[in-house]
């Protein structure tokens, strides 16, 4: 990773493999959150979603689902069939921060 990019991060990334649902413009997509932080996520998905799009992420944690509003900050081509999207979370709920703390404590 480019040092300049890592210095620009608002918070540390935690490696994950979590299935998520993405809602964008009346469409529903499946993705995998490959890392999470207090301010964003990287999600692998077989669907292209335009940068600057606002999306909703449904993140299953234990017996509940977190509904997170986010904005696509970047896209990255990973292969012929998969893209990665970097998202910025918009006003995540308090229980999302609890989820991140649980991930950090399990490292």
Identify the role of each PLM range.
Residues 31-32, 67-75:
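Short beta-strand-centered aromatic/proline hotspots
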Residues 1-36, 98-107:
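N-terminal helix initiation/capping motif
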Residues 25, 38, 75-80:
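Short, conserved beta-turn/loop elements at beta-strand boundaries and strand-helix junctions
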């Amino acid at each position: 990773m480019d040092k300049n990019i890592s210095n620009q991060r608002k918070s540390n990334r935690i490696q994950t493999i979590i299935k998520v649902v993405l809602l964008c413009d009346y469409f529903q997509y499946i993705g995998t959150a490959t890392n999470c932080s207090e301010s964003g996520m990287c999600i692998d998905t077989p669907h292209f979603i335009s940068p600057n799009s606002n999306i909703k992420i449904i993140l299953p944690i234990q017996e509940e689902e977190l509904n997170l509003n986010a904005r696509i900050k970047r896209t990255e081509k990973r292969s012929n069939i998969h893209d990665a999207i970097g998202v910025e979370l918009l006003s995540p709920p308090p229980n999302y921060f609890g989820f991140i703390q649980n991930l950090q404590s399990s490292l």
